[in-house]
Design a protein with these regions (language model features):
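Short, high-confidence coil segments that cap the C-terminus of an alpha-helix
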Residues: 33-35, 146
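Short, small-residue-enriched loops and turns at beta-alpha junctions
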Residues: 15-19, 45-47, 177
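Short, well-structured alpha-helical segments in soluble
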Residues: 21-33
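Glycine-rich phosphate/diphosphate-binding loop of Rossmann-like nucleotide-binding domains
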Residues: 15, 80-169, 173, 178-184, ...
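Anion-binding alpha/beta catalytic cores of soluble intermediary-metabolism enzymes, centered on
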Residues: 37-100
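Short beta-strand elements in bilobed, periplasmic/extracellular small-molecule ligand-binding domains
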Residues: 1-15, 129-131
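Conserved beta-strand scaffold positions in the cores of enzyme catalytic domains, especially
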Residues: 5-10, 170, 210-211
């Protein structure tokens, strides 16, 4: 934040914090004239409802674009803020000059935070969008026929080459912590944490025209998009 002249305040609360205690903090910052944007960092403790917490934020300061009001504006095609991950995906496609207009786009995952907003923004850009989810019977058939496949399901390396057509563009939004590395010397699994996406990167790499890595792909663009929403004047 400092590199672009933005002061960032990180308010850390205990894991046993109550909803009312968080609400008091958010309401205080809503009325602070020095604060232009507020986000709730996820995941939150299990006893708290993330969406209820988000809806405490003044929608004009909701730079993540996740409050009910901002989600409704997005659904109407008049977004105040494009949710950061969806915005980041579009910035990536724009930077690499990957066209969206008229393209077949499959979005795997329909969450409020990621899949839903991405599908909406892609539609606004003129793409032919199909959203796939756990109840979709022919997801692999749909994704194989798509020019762009965007994956956000929260399942490590779920998408392999059986889901991807030759020359497709793959955007992997997932980020998962997995453990385990086999050691022949010790003949056992060694607990070792690594981050992986929802796409089996090495399995599909040779058939795609472009793919985002995890980590280092969509994640940094999401952070950039938060700041872009912050410094861009909202309607």
């Amino acid at each position: 934040g400092l590199s672009i002249g933005v002061k960032v305040y990180h308010i850390k609360l205990s894991t046993d914090v109550t909803f009312d205690e968080v609400a008091d903090v958010v309401k205080r910052e809503n009325s602070n004239r020095e604060i232009s944007g507020i986000i709730i960092q996820s995941p939150v403790p299990e006893h708290l409802d993330f969406i209820k917490l988000v809806n405490l934020i003044d929608p004009k300061r909701d730079v993540d674009g996740l409050t009910d009001e901002n989600q409704e504006l997005l659904a109407e095609g008049k977004p105040r803020f494009v949710p950061a991950t969806a915005h980041g995906v579009m910035l990536l496609l724009d930077f690499y000059k990957i066209p969206v207009l008229g393209k077949k786009v499959a979005v795997v995952g329909r969450s409020r935070l990621v899949g839903g907003p991405i599908a909406k923004v892609m539609g606004m850009k003129g793409a032919n969008v199909t959203v796939c989810h756990s109840k979709t019977p022919n997801t692999a058939e749909i994704t194989r026929q798509s020019d762009i496949v965007i994956v956000a399901v929260g399942r490590p390396e779920f998408i392999n080459r059986s889901y991807i057509g030759e020359g497709a563009v793959v955007i992997d939004v997932g980020i998962n912590s997995v453990y385990g590395e086999y050691s022949e010397k010790l003949e056992e699994e060694i607990p070792k944490r690594k981050l992986t996406g929802d796409v089996d990167f090495s399995n599909v790499f040779d058939i795609v025209s472009a793919i985002t890595p995890v980590p280092g792909g969509v994640g940094p663009m999401t952070v950039l998009s938060l700041f872009d929403n912050l410094v861009s004047p909202s309607p």
